[in-house]
C-alpha cells in the first residue's frame, strides 16, 4: 500500500480550482465590478491576525448575554474594525454583512467565519446601536 502523492496533489489542485471558480462565480453574482475592485485593492493579509482574533473572541462570547457589558464592549470593537475596512464604501460593508448573516459565503473564504457567530454578533450590535 503506497500512497500516490502525485494523485493527491492533483486532487488538491482540482479542488483549489473548483473552489476558486466557485468564489469567482459568487463574487460576480453578489458584487459589481467596482465593488470587486474595492476588495482587490485591500490588503486583507495585513488584517488577518486581527480578524482571527475577532472571530475567536466572538466565538468565546457566544454563551454570554448579548446585552452584557463584556459583549457590548466587544460589539463596539467589532464595529470599529468593520468600519475601518470599509472606509469610503460603507454600503459594501452592509452588503457583505447581509451575505454573512444569510450564510451565503463560500467555505474557507473568510477564515473563522461561522454563520452562528454572525447572528450572535448581529444581536449584540443591534443592542449596541439601540442604546445610541
Regions from the PLM with identified roles:
Residues 1-132:
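Amphipathic alpha-helical "stalk" segments
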Amino acid at each position: 500500500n503506497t500512497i500516490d502523492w502525485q494523485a493527491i496533489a492533483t486532487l488538491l489542485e482540482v479542488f483549489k480550482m473548483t473552489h476558486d471558480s466557485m468564489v469567482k462565480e459568487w463574487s460576480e453574482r453578489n458584487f459589481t465590478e467596482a465593488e470587486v475592485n474595492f476588495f482587490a485593492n485591500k490588503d486583507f493579509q495585513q488584517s488577518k491576525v486581527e480578524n482571527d482574533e475577532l472571530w475567536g473572541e466572538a466565538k468565546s462570547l457566544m454563551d454570554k448575554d448579548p446585552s452584557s457589558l463584556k459583549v457590548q464592549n466587544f460589539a463596539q470593537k467589532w464595529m470599529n474594525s468593520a468600519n475601518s475596512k470599509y472606509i469610503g464604501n460603507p454600503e459594501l460593508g452592509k452588503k457583505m454583512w447581509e451575505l454573512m448573516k444569510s450564510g451565503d459565503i463560500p467555505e474557507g473564504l473568510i477564515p473563522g467565519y461561522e454563520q452562528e457567530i454572525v447572528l450572535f454578533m448581529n444581536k449584540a450590535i443591534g443592542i449596541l446601536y439601540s442604546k445610541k
